[in-house]
């Protein structure tokens, strides 16, 4: 084994989350943490028979705090990227958020079920053919610098006008002002947006697209020097995926299946 001469027992661990990123994690009146991730973590800790303590930490300093030893695990809808994998060790993914178009109800396509997309050109083309037909000559709004931006450019630029925004909330304002016809983002953003009374004229349009096409999914981070803790978490996540626990919590909090 690595640098340490003894294996750590891991009788208890401290997990940092933001506590303000609904429905992943949120803080209830009175200070208790709730949401998809805290409920999943409680289940995983039971499986591992480890005592768990959740602490609140801003996303900005989260990775630095982990590596400084302030806590042992970070859990905050963190998407696995090659860049981040250089500084933290990621567990197996417990979610892979699907994405969809949002449009004015009845303007494009009705919402349709989830399709899992891999890096397979034929599969992608088949899934998006109805969307391409519906969006021909229209304008699509997308936040710049997301995992979805290159996808929209690659598959829709030839038939639609693509407009980039600082964030998806600005794109929604333009959708309501009829300057654009659709906005593309993940289901977390979509559900939050659609739950607001002022957006009751909007709906999802076309399929929810999920799967490896969006990268590594959401996972927990641990220090690179704690492979034994990563292994414990991995087997607990695997078990929770296998017995339907993650799916059940996902449907409770996201109203859809976000399992990887």
Language-model features, listed with the residues they occupy:
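Short helix-initiation/N-cap motifs at beta->coil->alpha
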Residues: 38, 53-64, 125-128, 162-177, ...
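Extended ligand-binding regions for polar small-molecule ligands
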Residues: 38-48, 105-126, 138-139, 146, ...
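Hydrophobic residues within well-ordered alpha-helices
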Residues: 44, 66-67, 174-176, 233
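Extracytoplasmic small-molecule ligand-binding "clamshell" domains
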Residues: 5-78, 86, 243, 256
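Ligand-binding cleft/hinge of the Venus flytrap
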Residues: 25-28, 41-50, 110-123, 128-138, ...
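Periplasmic-binding protein-like
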Residues: 19, 96-100, 187, 194-234, ...
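Acidic, polar ligand-binding/catalytic clefts
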Residues: 42, 46, 51-132, 202-213
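A ligand-binding cleft/hinge motif common to bilobed small-molecule-binding domains
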Residues: 60-64, 77-86, 151-155, 169, ...
């Amino acid at each position: 084994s690595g640098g340490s001469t003894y294996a750590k027992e891991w009788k208890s661990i401290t997990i940092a989350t933001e506590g303000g990123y609904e429905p992943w994690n949120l803080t209830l009146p009175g200070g208790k943490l709730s949401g998809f991730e805290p409920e999943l973590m409680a289940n995983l800790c039971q499986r591992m028979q480890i005592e768990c303590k959740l602490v609140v930490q801003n996303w900005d300093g989260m990775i630095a705090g982990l590596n400084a030893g302030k806590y042992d695990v970070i859990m905050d809808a963190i998407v696995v990227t090659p860049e981040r994998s250089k500084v933290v060790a990621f567990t197996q993914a417990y979610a892979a958020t699907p994405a969809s178009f949002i449009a004015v109800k009845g303007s494009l396509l009705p919402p349709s079920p989830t399709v899992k997309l891999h890096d397979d050109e034929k599969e992608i083309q088949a899934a998006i053919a109805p969307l391409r037909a519906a969006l021909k000559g229209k304008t699509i709004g997308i936040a710049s610098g997301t995992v979805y931006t290159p996808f929209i450019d690659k598959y829709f630029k030839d038939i639609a006008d693509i407009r980039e925004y600082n964030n998806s909330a600005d794109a929604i304002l333009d959708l309501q002002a009829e300057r654009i016809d659709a906005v593309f983002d993940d289901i977390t953003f979509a559900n939050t947006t659609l739950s607001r009374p002022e957006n009751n004229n909007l709906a999802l349009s076309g399929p929810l697209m999920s799967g490896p096409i969006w990268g590594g999914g959401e996972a927990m981070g641990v220090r690179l020097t704690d492979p034994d803790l990563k292994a414990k978490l991995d087997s607990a996540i695997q078990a929770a995926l296998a017995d339907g626990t993650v799916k059940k919590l996902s449907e409770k909090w996201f109203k859809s299946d976000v399992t990887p």
